[in-house]
């Protein structure tokens, strides 16, 4: 069975891993780094992903960052007069990860396990699955990030019974999950979180502080300057990382803007104490979900055996201190917070292929599911933290006499009124026979699959007529849209490959032109005028083809020049070989004619003993 890769599709960075010899291994990107920035940029129609896209983000306004925060919404990103859905942009990142995983493995990759924040709703999960499909991946499983982290952590601890709290603060989302580990069973007891809290918010707090300080000093509002804001974003992210290791950092941005008197520079010293002060409200927001998860699991902090920190933002000292204070535990430091989620996804891939045995994963739905009933009330059918996959049915009736149809409004959330919860979808069960209100029996069944994706069925028990939908929110993509995006992605992949082929060909042609000039110089007078003219004409022809930029023309001119150059190159080699041979011969002769004064000539006389 082909390999199933594990992908942590992150807000700020992404990571890909694969199971090798029973152990998950992180696959480095082409730059040699173990995580890849979740950044996509466009320049003159050319697409860039990862490190190269991030490096030029300050100067390129057509750069997309933190697209994960838009997953599950109908919001689109417009770049170079073209609209892209969050699914399409995420697919570009996935396609890049898939590409370098294939290079590493030396085989085609078609299957993946992709992680999502535990608190992702149905629309966000479906969007992630669609992104995988657009990228040419069969998404075998969507699993929650904290669960994946626990899977990696507990892989070699299956003989120990433990209750583990996973605290996952990434670039854009925050989750807390509590799991029970024992005998190869990884059971999620409860999960809680905040999909609008992450490292980006800590960056924004620093940016707000810098903008306010600069305005106070210079009277200029940098927030109106897009280029300055991008530079501030990069500086804030760097300062945040620096303050995890030092107590003070200098933020220096020369020529940040211009005033009446000329260029202005931003020079501000940011201490860890100040950083802690401006980000305190964000740190405090992590406490509620921790308490909620413990309460839902029916556990006290003393019953937690281990606390695992996941996500780059857990390196912030104030966050670590908040975790210690809330759990009365020193967090476990045996896992890399940037890589553990992808590695856990690879372990799940191994479970699916049968390479990892005796591991059972029991995850939960993070939010309650139900429908709107009379009076705008939210009636729950499946409570949050129910183990999935699961199915639940309940019988409802009509609200009016002779009602011909019922509208089923499917919702996800914890509030008591329907309007305060997240709409997942609506559908109608029609052709209900005329009857007084309360008489028809309408059975509504909710199904949640192993990926946490919801389908709903409504059935008239009197007529056995039923209507089923797989929930698709306003932001969801139809099969036709996904198919179109798959074709676009493949076309882009082909275009990228063609661009690479063209770049490689140009480089080879440039190198060949250089080699011609060097060969002529090396041969000196040994090259005839006819040979010289022939090779120079072919070289000039290749130069013209390079200027014209037509691929087939470059290929033909390159092949012609190679044909003319080959005999001359052989002449250079023969000349070098002859010179080397001559040198060796000279050294041998010199050695033969040299007298060795250490040799003594002597006559020997045989002496016989008389006996």
Swiss-Prot record:
Keyword Chaperone appears in the UniProt entry: yes
UniProt GO molecular function: ATP binding; ATP-dependent protein folding chaperone; unfolded protein binding
Annotated SUPFAM superfamilies: Actin-like ATPase domain (SSF53067), Heat shock protein 70kD (HSP70), C-terminal subdomain (SSF100934), Heat shock protein 70kD (HSP70), peptide-binding domain (SSF100920)
PTM sites of type Phosphothreonine: 173
Pfam assignment, any one: HSP70
Cross-referenced InterPro entries: ATPase_NBD, Chaperone_DnaK, Heat_shock_70_CS, HSP70_C_sf, HSP70_peptide-bd_sf, Hsp_70_fam
Protein name, per record: Chaperone protein DnaK
Species of the source: Lysinibacillus sphaericus
């Amino acid at each position: 069975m082909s390999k199933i890769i594990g992908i942590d599709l992150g807000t700020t960075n992404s990571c890909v891993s694969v199971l090798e010899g029973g152990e998950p291994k992180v696959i480095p990107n082409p730059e040699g780094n173990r995580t890849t920035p979740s950044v996509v940029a466009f320049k003159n129609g050319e697409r860039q992903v990862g490190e190269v896209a991030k490096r030029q983000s300050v100067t390129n306004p057509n750069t997309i960052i933190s697209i994960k925060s838009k997953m599950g919404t109908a919001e689109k990103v417009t770049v170079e007069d073209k609209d892209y859905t969050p699914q399409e942009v995420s697919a570009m990142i996935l396609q890049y990860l898939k590409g370098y995983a294939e290079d590493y493995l030396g085989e085609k990759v078609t299957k993946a396990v992709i992680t999502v924040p535990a608190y992702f709703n149905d629309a966000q999960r479906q969007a992630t699955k669609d992104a995988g499909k657009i990228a040419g991946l069969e998404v075998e499983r969507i699993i929650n990030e904290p669960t994946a982290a626990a899977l990696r952590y507990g892989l070699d601890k299956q003989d120990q019974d433990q209750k583990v709290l996973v605290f996952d603060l990434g670039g854009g989302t925050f989750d807390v999950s509590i799991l029970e580990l024992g005998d190869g069973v990884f059971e999620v007891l409860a999960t809680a979180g905040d999909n609008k809290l992450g490292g980006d918010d800590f960056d924004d707090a620093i940016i707000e502080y810098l903008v306010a300080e600069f305005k106070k000093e210079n009277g200029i509002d940098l927030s109106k300057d897009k280029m300055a804001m991008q530079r501030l974003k990069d500086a804030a992210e760097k300062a945040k990382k620096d303050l995890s290791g030092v107590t003070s950092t200098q933020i220096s941005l020369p020529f940040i803007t211009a005033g009446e008197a000329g260029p202005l520079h931003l020079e501000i010293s940011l201490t860890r104490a100040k950083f802690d002060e401006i980000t305190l409200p964000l740190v405090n927001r992590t406490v509620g979900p921790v308490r909620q998860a413990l309460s839902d699991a029916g556990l006290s902090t003393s019953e937690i055996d281990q606390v695992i920190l996941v996500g780059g933002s857990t390196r912030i000292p104030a966050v670590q201190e908040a975790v210690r204070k809330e759990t009365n535990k020193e967090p476990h430091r045996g896992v890399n917070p940037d890589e553990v989620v992808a590695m856990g996804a690879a372990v799940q891939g191994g479970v699916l292929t049968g390479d990892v045995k005796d591991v059972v994963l029991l995850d939960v739905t993070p939010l309650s599911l139900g429908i709107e009933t009379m009076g705008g009330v939210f009636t729950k059918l499946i409570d949050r933290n129910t183990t999935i996959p699961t199915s639940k049915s309940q019988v409802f009736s009509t609200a009016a006499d002779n009602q011909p149809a019922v509208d089923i409004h499917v919702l996800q959330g914890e509030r008591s009124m329907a309007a305060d919860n997240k709409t997942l979808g609506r559908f109608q069960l029609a052709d209900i026979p005329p009857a007084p209100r309360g008489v028809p029996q309408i059975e509504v069944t909710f199904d949640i699959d192993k990926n946490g994706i919801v389908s709903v069925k409504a059935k008239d028990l009197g007529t056995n007529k039923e209507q089923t939908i797989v929930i698709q929110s306003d932001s969801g993509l139809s099969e036709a849209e996904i198919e179109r995006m798959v074709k676009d992605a493949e076309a882009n992949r082909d275009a990228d490959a063609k661009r690479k082929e063209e770049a490689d060909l140009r480089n080879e042609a440039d190198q060949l032109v250089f080699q011609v000039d060097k060969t002529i110089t090396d041969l000196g007078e040994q090259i005839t005028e006819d040979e010289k003219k022939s090779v120079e004409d072919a070289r000039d022809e290749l130069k013209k083809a390079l200027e014209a930029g037509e691929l087939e023309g470059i290929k033909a001119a390159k092949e012609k020049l190679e044909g003319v150059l080959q005999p001359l190159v052989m002449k250079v080699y023969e000349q070098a070989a002859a010179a080397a041979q001559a040198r060796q011969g000279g050294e041998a002769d010199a050695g033969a004619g040299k007298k060795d004064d250490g040799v003594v000539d002597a006559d020997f006389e045989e002496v016989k003993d008389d006996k």
